UniProtKB/Swiss-Prot annotation:
GO cellular component, one term: cytoplasm
Compartment(s) of residence: Cytoplasm
Residues forming the catalytic site: 47
Enzyme superclass (EC): lyase
Name used for this protein in its record: 3-hydroxyacyl-[acyl-carrier-protein] dehydratase FabZ
UniProt KW Lyase keyword: yes
Main subcellular location of this protein, as a coarse class: cytoplasm
Keywords: Cytoplasm, Lipid A biosynthesis, Lipid biosynthesis, Lipid metabolism, Lyase
Catalytic reactions on record: a (3R)-hydroxyacyl-[ACP] = a (2E)-enoyl-[ACP] + H2O
Function summary: Involved in unsaturated fatty acids biosynthesis. Catalyzes the dehydration of short chain beta-hydroxyacyl-ACPs and long chain saturated and unsaturated beta-hydroxyacyl-ACPs.
EC number, as in UniProt: 4.2.1.59
Sample GO molecular function, one term: (3R)-hydroxyacyl-[acyl-carrier-protein] dehydratase activity
Amino acid sequence: MIDIQGIKEALPHRYPMLLVDRVLEVSEDTIVAIKNVTINEPFFNGHFPQYPVMPGVLIMEALAQTAGVLELSKPENKGKLVFYAGMDKVKFKKQVVPGDQLVMTATFVKRRGTIAVVEAKAEVDGKLAASGTLTFAIGN
């Protein structure tokens, strides 16, 4: 398990863009983390005031950050950054609303040099909320 302090050591993101609260499981190529979604999230002020829904692009960002924690926690990547290089096969299946807990899983399926491909999914109450294939570049 990695707490918020460990996450902040791995990722450069800070409020309001830090979207990973805790890491539950870590292995060589897979990480499982959570994001507790509250009504206090700044994006709910405008998306949508009468019916708050977490923007899908921020769910994908949370998944990217989850993968980033795994990659940037490795000694050889200390102090580096992870940049989006692409997203494929992204699907949104369930709305994410205040009070939900996103359980995010990211599995690295391919690495070549500084490029990595990740299969990622976010679930709420065991139901798929979003999924996709994310491509990253690791750099300074």
